[in-house]
């Protein structure tokens, strides 16, 4: 398994279709933001879309961004759009994305990363 940044990938159209195929409305929203070129406007210029992949399969994805859905706020950065495809759930694969975000945050000198959800007991 490998964690990659969507915007560093040569397979962007492939990964976009995988994100779009998720059974979650926020996945569709993320795909729309990517497709219409407004992702960075929505979440910040330094944002990343992290993908956990195995070959050409997308296992999990999330964002690491300056802004999320709670605005206005001084809190930053945010982990958002956290999703694991159903067939991969229960194996803690998304933890690999969390570890990558923790690594990026440490490199940036950021002591905390925030996550927002309206789901109870999901994370």
State the predicted function of each range.
Residues 39-51, 78:
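A short helix-loop-beta-strand connector motif used in the catalytic cores of GNAT acetyltransferases and
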Residues 81-84, 90-103:
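Conserved acetyl-CoA-binding loop-helix of GNAT-fold acetyltransferases
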Residues 15-19, 79, 97:
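Residue-level preference for hydrophobic side chains embedded in well-ordered alpha helices
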């Amino acid at each position: 398994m490998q964690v990659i940044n969507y915007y560093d990938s040569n397979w962007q159209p492939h990964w976009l279709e995988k994100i779009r195929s998720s059974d979650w409305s926020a996945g569709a929203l993320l795909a729309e933001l990517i497709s219409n070129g407004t992702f960075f406007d929505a979440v910040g210029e330094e944002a990343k879309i992290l993908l956990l992949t195995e070959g050409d399969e997308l296992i999990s994805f999330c964002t690491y961004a300056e802004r999320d859905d709670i605005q206005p706020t001084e809190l930053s950065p945010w982990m958002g759009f956290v999703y694991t495809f159903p067939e991969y759930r229960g194996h803690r694969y998304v933890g690999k994305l969390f570890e990558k975000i923790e690594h990026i945050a440490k490199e940036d000198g950021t002591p905390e990363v925030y996550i927002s959800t309206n789901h109870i007991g999901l994370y």
